């Protein structure tokens, strides 16, 4: 009964954990790394066709985005997730595949001119569609038994529509252990979706720590703040452009704007138009509406019971085609434009920035995190000029940020979630946080709650039956392109060899009870291998 850490260890993205139990290989999350990448990830040490099934906490690409990649390499098992997560992954994994293929086409077009070898995308649309067909939707709080000796339950994590913490119970012979994977724990009092649900019993916890070193501070009145920004912008005769993540944040903005319109908080601009210009956001908004009864909070359900759609209103315009998108910029009336991507590095938002950044009447409002190196980050840090489509654009528009808006719990929310366990777990593994943040939050859990904690690096292997670390990996820093990659390759090769060693132990245990003559032949093979490579005399 082993837990192996693969991704989002001392890093925020690329969540992936491997459970080896009951003769099965199980993945919990299979995410794609996004943004800065500081450490090498250990490879999954089994053939991907030998993965029995995947348990998925939620649809964000840093948790789900590599599912098509493992499908491309042989995985054909079911992916268990909540119903809403299954539906969101249908659109998000197809969108991710489109991006992979578009990037590969662009790089190959450029590379051919330079004589470079062909760039192969991580996966194709066929791979995405293949794994999407294998999703199995599960209701919240219903126990499922995907394999003998293994049961699981999805509990609302309050982070995104359909997001979940996963309670995994494993029974091997006379040993039973309960492992809770927190997933991404949501912020309280988010619009539309419910607050995180607490769990109370676990032998082991694998816990995120995204904001494990900071507080969001006091939450502003978002409706009041947004209405004031709209009022000031429209009074200048300008447009309000909101770069927004297509899934989650866009629907929150629609929720706020519906209330602003219903309460008449913007004066002199009755019936103002709101354009949502993102095909992915439009599909996601439909899915939100389809899952209102299992995912929406009390306030949203009160509106629905009154016959009010909490994320729709008069004046809402949906752009589907590229012609729809282009026509927005011919509308001379003051308006709100919500478009992806949220960090302004891709998508239709770049066209809207080109048409609106130069005009001092307009406002660009950021409602989400802007990573270092993105166009969005440059704008909030005061760039006077930026490049769009290879052309310089002067920044004259007002640049604003909506503070404190986050789908992640802050350090206090994380501690509240951890405090809910009625008995101390045997171990808490702190993951999904920046390098030092994981260590800081692990120490707080120890100092304030008395928990035995560990912030593992990728490649760490833990025996859950005996509560002992079998192998504690060291973080292997990714070398910059200008540096020699020799040391990195050596470290990666050793980690791979070590992982195969642990796999060999698993294979040996599987052969218990086989005929003696087969065991003797197996022993000779292993002995020969050890004799060949034993370096103790060198």
Model-inferred region functions:
Residues 229-374, 387, 437-439, 444-447, ...:
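Hard-cation-handling environments
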Residues 387-418:
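Generic long, charged, amphipathic alpha-helical segments
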Residues 94-99, 103-107, 221-223, 256-261, ...:
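Short secondary-structure boundary/capping segments
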Residues 150-154, 287-295, 415-416, 465-477:
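Short, surface-exposed amphipathic charged segments that create phosphate/polyanion-binding patches used
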Residues 359, 434-478:
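C-terminal, active-site-flanking charged/polar segments
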Residues 459-518:
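Charged, amphipathic alpha-helical linkers/stalks
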Residues 1-55, 60, 64, 71-252, ...:
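His/Asp/Glu-rich metal-coordinating catalytic cores
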Residues 100-105, 292-305, 387, 470-494:
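A polyampholytic, Gly/Pro-enriched intrinsically disordered region
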